[in-house]
Amino acid sequence: MTALNVLIYPDDHLKVVCEPVTEVNDAIRKIVDDMFDTMYQEKGIGLAAPQVDILQRIITIDVEGDKQNQFVLINPEILASEGETGIEEGCLSIPGFRALVPRKEKVTVRALDRDGKEFTLDADGLLAICIQHEIDHLNGILFVDYLSPLKRQRIKEKLIKYKKQIAKS
């Protein structure tokens, strides 16, 4: 298993609407394993494939971070949602920044697991928020897109400087 490079905003690939996975095979399972490795290495609780420059509809989640409650959602689709909530969200692709994002309190999602079997999941709390955040990534939406243009621009400028500093070192 290999940790992958996480793209940093404003990378254009983070704004792409991802293609569905047509077949869950060993190559997809390898991507899933690498995504989990990357997510844990970066201390995240969720990761969407476009964040590691794989433009397919794949999500890995472990809100507990204990590797005991891992979720793989391939081609996820929210079927139902209810309630209103929101927390300050962070993102591995937007390091050092957090913002309050409006989300649904509960979601029902349908997806394929790592073996290609369809399942339905009822989620609430942090898991529901994480699912919504990661599905946004699959649709080319980042949490900064919920912010005012001025706040979004300030974050963009700071991260461009950050990326230049990283490139020099």
UniProtKB/Swiss-Prot annotation:
Keywords (A to Z) from UniProt: Hydrolase, Iron, Metal-binding, Protein biosynthesis
Principal EC category: hydrolase
InterPro entries the UniProt entry points to: Peptide_deformylase, Peptide_deformylase_sf
A Pfam family the protein falls into: Pep_deformylase
Origin superkingdom: Bacteria
Named cofactor requirement(s): Fe(2+)
Catalytic activity field: N-terminal N-formyl-L-methionyl-[peptide] + H2O = N-terminal L-methionyl-[peptide] + formate
BP GO terms, sorted: co-translational protein modification; translation
EC number: 3.5.1.88
Gene Ontology MF: a single term: metal ion binding
Binding site for Fe cation: C91, H133, H137
Active site: E134
Cofactor note: Binds 1 Fe(2+) ion.
NCBIfam families, per database record: pept_deformyl (TIGR00079), PRK00150.1-3 (NF001159)
Similarity comment: Belongs to the polypeptide deformylase family.
Entry function: Removes the formyl group from the N-terminal Met of newly synthesized proteins. Requires at least a dipeptide for an efficient rate of reaction. N-terminal L-methionine is a prerequisite for activity but the enzyme has broad specificity at other positions.
Name of the molecule in the record: Peptide deformylase
Organism listed in the record: Haemophilus influenzae (strain 86-028NP)
Gene that produces this protein: def
